Amino acid sequence: MTLSITGVIAQSFCAGAFCGPKAKEQVILETVACNLCGSRRYKTVYEMPDARLFPDEYFTVVECDECGLGFVNPRPDRQEIQKYYPRDYYENEESASFARYLQKRFTQQARYLKEVEDRPGPRKLLDVGCFNGEFPRFMAARGWDVSGVEISEVSQRIKDFPVFSQEFSEISICEPTYDAITAWAVLEHVHDPLAYFQKASQLLKKGGLFVFQMPNFASTTSRCLFWEDVPRHLYFYTRENVAQYLEKAGLVLQREDNRGNVYKSSPASWLPYMIRTRLQRKAFTYKDKPLSSREFRKLHHLQRGITAGLKYLAYSPASAVDRMLWPAVEAVQILRKTYGSSTYVARKRALAIAECWHPAAKVRTMSPSQGNGI
């Protein structure tokens, strides 16, 4: 898809407690058509800042009038987006408890690949967005021949298995190579998700699996509670959108798991949202979202403890009650299949994309056998 660079300037102003001392900065954005259906007709869903790094920069999330895909529009282009991924964004926590969490999560992720794992003979896995390589190493220990894709500098640290250090859609391999391809919390970050789905179809062997996790745009958490990591999250998908992407790419949906088994997506601020929209009959904007307890402590320079807890209760009684309601709200969401994130398992069709397709971006020649840094 051809993208038009517009000279749109991001809105720049302070947002409540997130207002910082940083000077206003002009950000050149691009306006794009829907990546799924090509329509340029859309409506605004919400506006919110980059709460993580640049709280004075606001972005707009829109929904396509034709297919319902959600996306940031206008958005930072491929060059501009780099400033929103500083080096420390890729730093992982180092603690025994976090290591245990990763092992538990990787075990759950591996279950989605059991069908392939139980087949006789060697099996090859490509993990897209492999970060520092921990999940591929986990799978290698289970007997898989692993490779990864990671465009950040962290990929340079990986020496024990092959890594593609460029966009997944741009790697030069075109023939069916892998028994499984995984993308955990990746497809919401990319500028051209259709190219990623198509590339997965090209590289999968017949009957191979594409397993991916992403936010659920049909959920209150994603759509209404301002917990998406904008502008790093660029796209927001419903299950209908996923089915359409898979159809275009020659993949068939096998199942969706909407239970939050890989990444949790807690409905924080659900009660304040319900009070505002159902009782007060008013719109719930980003400025209406209470600070989290962590944000509140940081703002007021408080240590975690009873004093901080009481002050937070006085600041937002609804938020304190909200936290206690999460388990019940999540249980209902899971029953209704409206939890904040979903994991999908798709299979390659017998007849799918065969030609070597690349987007307009520059392609660098590489092969998994070349090892790290390619």
Model-derived regions, located:
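Short hydrophobic/aromatic beta-strand or adjacent loop that forms the aromatic wall/cage
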Residues: E57-V61, G68, W184, T338-Y344
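S-adenosyl-L-methionine-dependent methyltransferase catalytic module, highlighting the catalytic core
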Residues: H191-K199, L209-A350
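Conserved SAM-binding loop and adjacent beta-strand
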Residues: S95-R111
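N-terminal juxtadomain amphipathic helix
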Residues: I5, I9, F18-S97
